Every structure is written in C-alpha cells, then in structure tokens.
C-alpha cells in the first residue's frame, strides 16, 4: 500500500517561478558530453530508457555495475548512466547541471520520454534539475527515488549543527536552504509519474517519511518496502543496490503507465534475497567495495564552514 504523501513545502515567494526557463549550463560542454554513457539500445528506443544517477561518494560503475546495470543488460533494457563531478561530495547544484544535460541527451537519442532512477543523493539532483530547468519535465515520464533525501535528513542536522562539513551534507540537512528551494512551488510536476521508495531500516535518511513526495495519488506513490514485505531488512545502502522489492517496484513503474503499483508486485518477491543482476557469489565483495569507495570519497571531501550559497537563478529576483 502506498503511504500518504507529505505536506507541500513552505516558502515560495523568494524562489524562481516554477515555469521560468532555466539558466544556461555553466559546466563546460565537453565535460557534460563525457559524463553520459548509454547502451546502443537507448538510441531510437521503443521503450522508456532508464537514466541512472549515482548517490554520494560513488560513480555509476561503483554504484550500479554490479546490480542495476547488470540487471538491465540481462533484460536487454535500454539505459544510460551519468557520472557526477567529484563523486557527488561537492555542491549538489553542480551535479544537477550534469543531470540536466543527461536528461536532455537521453531524451534526444531515445526520441521519447525517459525514466530517471536515483539512489539517496542521486534522487535529489534530478529533482533539483526538474525544479529549476522546466524544459526537462516534458522529457521525463517516470522518476524513481530509492531512499532519496527529498526533505533532508535529521542525521545531517545532528552531525553538522553549525556547518563545518562537506557541501552535500550541509545541503541535505532538513533545515538547509537547498532543500527549501528544491521543494518550493511544487514538489512534483504534471506529466511525470513519481515513485519514491523507502525502508524503515534507513540509518542515514531520517526520520521515516522524509523521502515522501506530495502530489495526487494518480501520479505520486510513496512506498515503504516493508508495506509489501514486512520482513524486508534492507537498509539505506541495500534499497539502492541489492533489494529485490525495490527493483520490482521500479521496473513496474517503468513498464506501466503511472507510478509503481504495489498491488501489481507479486509477494513472491519477498522470497528473493537479491535483485536480478547481483551475483550471489560476489555480492559480499561487491558491497564491501562499494562501501569502501563511498566512505573514502566522503572522508576526503572538502569541509566548508557553511552550506554553499544558492545560485542566482534559484531566486525570484536574480
């Protein structure tokens, strides 16, 4: 069963109107072009191409090669993936520009609306892109967030009460200006089906419900893994890398009109230990490598005294 959507975010008057054209991308064009890789089947695809966006501390290979990309390859499902700057430990506003380009590129080569899938911070940068570059909304059919930090996390508020942290962590506080701006005006937009998945065992994105998005049930589904499989033990990392229920819900969203429908997912998925694409014989080492890489990159992230300043285009008066 889908959970009730959270209330819409607050202040809107200081932020850009939701339909004001977005700014020109500031990232060099060559860097943007190099950041997106697609399968041959993504070109002129008859199916909804999946664009995968990695989370904090990792690139698409570390995040998805051993799970999602392998599963989509096995199913012969068209997909693209975007590499974000600095392994996503810097300013999320910069990452969002890469996502804007990736959406436009994937839409252009596929010649039809696409799906965006992101885990943790990888579910946030696409929403920032959709909010401040409104042309991208007509290019996206589905958004799937895997424990996306949609309203910030109290863990970050506790860890960085006075700043002095990595840019992304300060921006993903529940009290951040970044989160307020991203959720201003509207959290979700007509024409896009939103599926936001969460787990009650999330150790990083808290409190429970902070992943939820507001909007009509016809196009917004907020779903806890435990509402389908009560014994599902996946945590924040598991929901984005190996959980079979999350994969089943995401693929349901991509292959049917509207957001994921929990009623359409067989409860037999609860008996699956790992999602398709994950090799049981290498799962432990693959997971360990993912955690090691992410932890190392986060540890090396530059510490800032305060949240990065919001860009001028974010505001009504710029």
Name each model-derived stretch.
Residues 11-29, 34-113, 281-312:
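Active-site catalytic motif of lipid deacylating hydrolases and related acyltransferases
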Residues 83-86, 112-116, 259-268:
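Surface-exposed patches in mature extracellular/periplasmic domains of secreted proteins
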Residues 190-318:
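C-terminal catalytic-base region of ester-bond hydrolases, centering on the histidine
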Residues 53-56, 77, 82-87, 118-121, ...:
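Active-site-proximal beta-strand/loop segments in catalytic clefts of secreted hydrolases
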Residues 54, 93-188:
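Serine-dependent carboxylesterase/thioesterase catalytic core
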Residues 1-9:
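Secretory targeting and sorting signals
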Residues 42-46, 73-74, 108-110, 135-139, ...:
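Extracellular/periplasmic catalytic domains that process cell-envelope and extracellular macromolecules
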